[in-house]
């Protein structure tokens, strides 16, 4: 099968969130099953042309009355046969930032930028004389792709090509002024028919939900949640209408990177039978953060974007957040790695100065993120909503028991602790509040000090979990086949 991925993020070239990891890992998993997978993405400012191969001849892309000339570069995903085509346009992509910058969080010309990507994706296929069986578009930034396939390319060489659209996070929809609609390259007559119209604005995600042959999202529970107003972000009606075409497929984990027995970032590698090595990583983590080195005290780790979705108000809010009370009342240590909202960064620094058992690192550090997973005993992830989540799966594989809210992919991957039997793989909050976080952390700490056999049993079970991409790839192939069948029935 010939599969074209269109994405705004791709590891190792550009990453803002888990989207980048997911598209890379899925593409490689499909290629390993002998499918011809190619990825189209922008060549951002930080992607050096010197490391890419230029494809001769510029391409003309028409957006409204304007003609844009774009270049194309080529490379491969590391250690794979997956080709990556980079759309090169200095005005659109020759700047720092994927969607925005520190000075402009959401670029004002994003409609034009990502419309250019969508149109260019089809032009690249023509240029390479390669017509895919399926176009798989990821998140709002690629939302125009299924629209073009349905309305603009329906009588071209792409007439038999099916579309699949994956929702990685309903909270990000690509909503812009109606006056930018001509930048999509569509006619004003298409404003309503394409699904772009959203309360007198344009909405890339909505257009994709309306136009795609099949829809997926990144966990079974999230597929159910987004059909409800609480999690649907105003799109729940469309998703209920299209529920037969919507499939939830749990993301996998790249176990070549996240594997405690092979992890190159941690000082002591281990497995479920050598957990004493995990304790050595704990001592290194404590020393690294300037905490008292004491393996008898449980360490609670957290790696997160510091945004409202992640439950930061309930955990770190200066007025009612539970972190200060947790660290004051319970014998434990807490380490946090992340960046995001300025008030939260300031609060974390304040807690680090005020509390001897709390430390933070503002920013991101790959080596430190692996050490936190390996050296912590518990992992905090009290998300308000979580489409899939990766860190709870990393934590399970590392024997670091997650503390999560029952939502989305967290509900699909973490089994709540049973005090009587010792079964489970983590600790689950039924609802999100400062008190529920406090109670659940206290529950975990109680088990640590009083139920050592249960902790060991849970760790062993957690580390036996399988989160490879092979299962997810098979499920996506089924969705692709359904999309092709649906497209054929409409011809």
From Swiss-Prot:
<keyword id="KW-0808">Transferase</keyword>
<dbReference type="Pfam" id="PF08323">
    <property type="entry name" value="Glyco_transf_5"/>
</dbReference>
<dbReference type="InterPro" id="IPR013534">
    <property type="entry name" value="Starch_synth_cat_dom"/>
</dbReference>
<dbReference type="GO" id="GO:0005978">
    <property type="term" value="P:glycogen biosynthetic process"/>
</dbReference>
<feature type="binding site">
    <location>
        <position position="15"/>
    </location>
    <ligand>
        <name>ADP-alpha-D-glucose</name>
    </ligand>
</feature>
<comment type="similarity">
    <text>Belongs to the glycosyltransferase 1 family. Bacterial/plant glycogen synthase subfamily.</text>
</comment>
<comment type="pathway">
    <text>Glycan biosynthesis; glycogen biosynthesis.</text>
</comment>
<dbReference type="GO" id="GO:0009011">
    <property type="term" value="F:alpha-1,4-glucan glucosyltransferase (ADP-glucose donor) activity"/>
</dbReference>
<comment type="function">
    <text>Synthesizes alpha-1,4-glucan chains using ADP-glucose.</text>
</comment>
<dbReference type="GO" id="GO:0004373">
    <property type="term" value="F:alpha-1,4-glucan glucosyltransferase (UDP-glucose donor) activity"/>
</dbReference>
<protein>
    <recommendedName>
        <fullName>Glycogen synthase</fullName>
        <ecNumber>2.4.1.21</ecNumber>
    </recommendedName>
</protein>
<keyword id="KW-0320">Glycogen biosynthesis</keyword>
<dbReference type="Pfam" id="PF00534">
    <property type="entry name" value="Glycos_transf_1"/>
</dbReference>
<dbReference type="InterPro" id="IPR011835">
    <property type="entry name" value="GS/SS"/>
</dbReference>
<dbReference type="InterPro" id="IPR001296">
    <property type="entry name" value="Glyco_trans_1"/>
</dbReference>
<keyword id="KW-0328">Glycosyltransferase</keyword>
